[in-house]
UniProtKB/Swiss-Prot annotation:
Taxonomic source organism: Nitrobacter winogradskyi (strain ATCC 25391 / DSM 10237 / CIP 104748 / NCIMB 11846 / Nb-255)
InterPro entries from the UniProt entry: Rbsml_bL25/Gln-tRNA_synth_N, Ribosomal_bL25/Gln-tRNA_synth, Ribosomal_bL25_b-dom, Ribosomal_bL25_C, Ribosomal_bL25_long, Ribosomal_L25_dom, Ribosomal_uL5_bac-type
Gene behind this protein: rplY
Complex formation: Part of the 50S ribosomal subunit; part of the 5S rRNA/L5/L18/L25 subcomplex. Contacts the 5S rRNA. Binds to the 5S rRNA independently of L5 and L18.
CDD domains, alphabetized: Ribosomal_L25_TL5_CTC
Protein name as catalogued: Large ribosomal subunit protein bL25
Amino acid sequence: MATVMELKATARPKSGKGAARAERRAGRVPAVIYGNKQPPQPISVEEPELRQRILAGRFLTTIFDINLDGKKHRVIPRDFHLDPVKDFPIHVDFMRLGEGATIRVSVPLRLLKADVAPGVKRGGTVNLVTHAIDVECAAESIPQFIEADVGALEISHSLHLSDLQLPPGVKPLAREDVTLVTIVPPSGYAEELKAAAAAGAAAPAAGAAPAAAAAGAKAPAGGGDKKK
């Protein structure tokens, strides 16, 4: 069950660029609630609180209850914009969630047992190819993260989407069996493999020469005179 957070907001009587700039000058962030077959509702949120929510992480997968004039709106953020220079929030889009709604979200991947993976112990490096997985699930069941166990990976081996144990009711959107994690070989690993292969091939050849010489010494001498 996803955790539902409270978020304070006030209704905006006006929309448009001029009204939005006025909200920002007053220390509030203009936003809108839309969806669920209802008209859009312009709102504003206190900038410090909203910035704290965004910086806390997983903002786009967190469900919020917004109370407006005594009516509670259950929403999820679908998009937000930051000031390109000062990096503070300047607008947020919230989508209403109806009862039993399903939603598509991008859930971050969390690695397990990376430090005990055989490939890591042999000097390899964990390469996180896919940082998040796009899934579909009930809005009330959005996982905070999806776990990926890499504890058995060797050097040059990979973990794919089909290797994951997804939570019940969570379905991946990707049709391909995408690569999630790989163990990158350490520097010089390819040369070590070539040297080991060459040494392995040379060993049987070196052992064959003395054996051939010994066999020749035991063979009877040919070409001698026969008794008549």
